[in-house]
Amino acid sequence: MKLLEIKIESSYDVEDALAYFATEDLKALGTEARRRSDFEQAGWLHDSTVVDMDDIPNLPDELEFIAYFDEETDPEEMVKCFKDKLAELAGYGLKTAPGEISVDYVADQDWNTVWKKYYHVINLSRHLAIVPEWEDYQPVFKDQEIIRLDPGLAFGTGNHQTTQLAMLGIERAMVKPLTVADVGTGSGILAIAAHKLGAKSVLATDISDESMTAAEENAALNGIYDIALQKTSLLADVDGKFDLIVANILAEILLDLIPQLDSHLNEDGQVIFSGIDYLQLPKIEQALAENSFQIDLKMRAGRWIGLAISRKHD
């Protein structure tokens, strides 16, 4: 059996959007990304190994995004869908160039594990490290919590700046045990981080079956079996209120989430947003203000923004 492989040469700006579009809208069997920055940082991350960029084959200028589909999928239709999506993203002011799309067919056993060689330990902070389940690791700091992860088909490896901003926001907020909701959990990484940092309880929601499975399996990798999982869109059908609501999702979806926050957030609760391109920040700021929320802290990594949010108080 073979798989249809769609490769897109583009920029870091659109990685999250393409991953979400491919998985949720086009029902891709899986996605992966090759980032030039991953190789440029390799010497710093992995035992000071010297990496000659000229020795790496087919290295992208910024990002090579790859999506895999069933062999029977119409390649022309997929190319058109991705071209239309790139045009839409460019309309938001995001860099999509060069935007070149290529099509190939690969053996189904090739893609499922090849991405693992680019995914290594991430020392996020003195309190958190993200460790692939196939790697050995000794904590750098005595009280550093290790998150074991096998992201599989779900979004959220910890490599991306948006995930790291969200995790730093959680770490800042968790000064005492809190009830936490992770909206759009993906691989479950943020829910697991909250649990590791001492959350009183954690609910993880997602609309994707693959995410529900990945989150449950990754929690089990970490010996965690009490994260509540609920398949739903954002906070729809979710009962109760929380001390902390976390969402690392696209800005367009955050706009849909904002009106749901009030009925699900405790009076003195906090919200952590990530996944916001700085060009889209004004829309988020306006929507928060219109719903009586204020921004307490802005965090930035590259062009990505993370926010710590609370209710406005007169």
Swiss-Prot record:
One of its GO terms (molecular function) is protein-lysine N-methyltransferase activity. It comes from the Bacteria. Keywords: Cytoplasm, Methyltransferase, S-adenosyl-L-methionine, Transferase. It catalyses: L-lysyl-[protein] + 3 S-adenosyl-L-methionine = N(6),N(6),N(6)-trimethyl-L-lysyl-[protein] + 3 S-adenosyl-L-homocysteine + 3 H(+). S-adenosyl-L-methionine binds at T163, G184, D206, N248. The keyword Cytoplasm applies. Its EC number is 2.1.1.-. One of its GO terms (cellular component) is cytoplasm. Belongs to the methyltransferase superfamily. PrmA family. Methylates ribosomal protein L11. This is Ribosomal protein L11 methyltransferase. It comes from Lactobacillus delbrueckii subsp. bulgaricus (strain ATCC BAA-365 / Lb-18).
